[in-house]
């Protein structure tokens, strides 16, 4: 019985570890999304190019493909600073 008890407790530790990994992944993706909204809103009252530079630096620090894709998609809004370029499309 002690062998079975120790095996089941090992299984519990593995499941706890997996759930912790999943929660950290979901936290990571939500912070990526918030960085994305900052990135895409570079032309929304932030001073155009100068406002977008801060978003670009933040995107480089995060270093994800999603951020890079949003930078490439939103370069026009960052450069022009148009008032109707708020958020990601």
From Swiss-Prot:
Segment forming the signal sequence: none
Organism of origin: Dictyostelium discoideum (Social amoeba)
Gene coding for it: hssl22
Family statement drawn from the similarity comment of this UniProt entry: Belongs to the hssA/B family.
Protein name in UniProt: HssA/B-like protein 22
Source taxon at top rank: Eukaryota
Pfam families: Coiled
PANTHER family: HSSA/B-LIKE PROTEIN 17-RELATED, HSSA_B-LIKE PROTEIN 17-RELATED
């Amino acid at each position: 019985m002690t062998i079975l008890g120790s095996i089941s407790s090992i299984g519990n530790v593995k499941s706890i570890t997996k759930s912790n990994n999943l929660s950290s992944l979901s936290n990571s993706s939500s912070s990526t999304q918030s960085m994305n909204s900052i990135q895409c809103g570079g032309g929304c009252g932030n001073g155009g190019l100068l406002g977008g530079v801060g978003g670009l630096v933040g995107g480089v620090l995060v270093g994800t493909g999603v951020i890079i894709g949003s930078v490439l998609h939103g370069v026009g809004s960052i450069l022009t600073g148009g008032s109707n370029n708020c958020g990601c499309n």
